[in-house]
Curated annotation (Swiss-Prot):
Keywords: ATP-binding, Cell shape, Cell wall biogenesis/degradation, Cytoplasm, Ligase, Magnesium, Manganese, Metal-binding, Nucleotide-binding, Peptidoglycan synthesis
Boundaries of every ATP-grasp domain copy: 118-317
Pfam families, alphabetized: Dala_Dala_lig_C, Dala_Dala_lig_N
Cofactor comment: Binds 2 magnesium or manganese ions per subunit.
Binding site for Mg(2+) 1: D272, E284
Stated name of the protein: D-alanine--D-alanine ligase
Main subcellular localisation: cytoplasm
Organism, scientific name: Flavobacterium psychrophilum (strain ATCC 49511 / DSM 21280 / CIP 103535 / JIP02/86)
Alphabetized SUPFAM superfamilies for the sequence: Glutathione synthetase ATP-binding domain-like (SSF56059), PreATP-grasp domain (SSF52440)
Protein purpose: Cell wall formation.
Record flagged with keyword 4Fe-4S: no
Family: Belongs to the D-alanine--D-alanine ligase family.
Pathway: Cell wall biogenesis; peptidoglycan biosynthesis
Length: 328
């Protein structure tokens, strides 16, 4: 079976994705699969073999080496941000009938859009921060935002990952800079009220037909919040299992599973919460969580005594069992 381990992306998250892809390459069972490293970058789609690059034929996601055309039986998607986490790659693979891991194009697009995710979860009574949605060019009144949300508050790109473009605003004179920072990542932003509590992250996946919670990790950032530096440059402490009460642990696990199932997820995911007054408040869900050695999801898999090669086998089995929507 030819397996494409797809990594990279078009955003600043591509560096993290390349690290995630390496973990997958190192943990796939080479006795079961013919494994290929595939880079999808803005100006370069290619297969990398012993340092040499072979261009991907986008018509059918194949490549040619020494006159021999190789096609893939399944794609393992580790692309963070666009186009691998927002539904674009998933739609492409659906159209050319390539099975792929993770959730489908609709769930990917939905969960990459913070506003739309929050709107859907409102139906399921999931506690969350208050928020204001704005687009570039809208009239923005800092005093009205303060009145609605209080201080401090967070300014976030509506569609971005790895906390890129996120700022905490403690005073209104910081708002203009925060808006510029967020709008540099996206033309839409969310402004959210501050939740004062314990931040936790929860790995969830579909494993052998069951929705399974891997573990709950407590996040202690050296910065004001769990930003890019804290996530990837060692500016945080991540404690698994989280130092929370048994009641809180149960509530967080139940909420994470409810969100996963309510949104129709499949594959690996990571859901972030702030526990405030004993109640977990939803922050966001990541449908292509980081898999670098520094990332939370692999740490939680180790805590749960889950074998990464077996987890990847499970992902491939799920991908092969799912038919494209147009074939149903």
């Amino acid at each position: 079976m030819n397996v494409a381990v797809v990594m990279g992306g078009y955003s600043d998250e591509s560096v993290i994705s390349l690290r995630s892809g390496q973990l997958i390459l190192n943990n796939l069972d080479k006795s079961k699969y013919n494994i290929f490293e595939v880079h999808i970058l803005l100006k370069d789609w290619s297969v990398v073999i012993e340092g040499e690059k072979y261009p991907i034929n986008k018509a059918d996601f194949s490549f040619t080496k020494n006159g021999v055309i190789t096609k893939f039986d399944v794609a393992i998607n580790t692309v963070h941000g666009t186009p691998g986490e927002d539904g674009h790659l998933q739609s492409y693979w659906e159209l050319i009938d390539i099975p792929y891991t993770g959730c489908n194009f609709y769930q990917s697009a939905l969960t990459f859009n913070k506003r739309d995710t929050l709107s859907v979860l409102t139906k399921f009574n999931i506690p969350k921060a208050k928020s204001i949605y704005l687009r570039k060019g809208d009239v923005i009144d800092g005093n009205e935002i303060k009145k609605a949300l209080g201080l401090p508050f967070f300014v976030k790109p509506n569609q971005s990952g790895s906390s890129l473009g996120v700022s905490k605003v403690d005073a209104l004179d910081q708002l203009e800079k925060a808006l510029e920072f967020a709008f540099a990542e996206d033309n839409e932003i969310l402004i959210e009220s501050y939740l004062n509590g314990t931040e936790v992250s929860v790995g969830v996946l579909n494993y052998k037909g069951q929705t399974k919670v891997l573990g709950i990790t407590e996040i202690l950032s050296q910065n004001d919040f769990f930003d890019y530096e804290a996530k990837y440059l060692g500016k945080s402490e991540e404690i698994t299992p989280a130092r929370i009460s048994k009641e809180e642990e149960i509530l967080v696990a139940e909420s994470a599973k409810k969100i996963y199932n309510s949104l129709g997820m499949s594959g690996f995911s990571r859901t972030d919460f702030i526990i405030m007054n004993g109640i977990p408040h939803f922050i966001e869900i990541n449908t292509n969580p980081g898999l670098s050695p520094q990332s939370i999801f692999p740490q939680q898999a180790m805590f749960a005594k889950m074998d990464m090669p077996q987890m990847l086998d499970n992902e491939i089995t799920l991908a092969l069992s799912r038919k494209p929507i147009w074939k149903k």
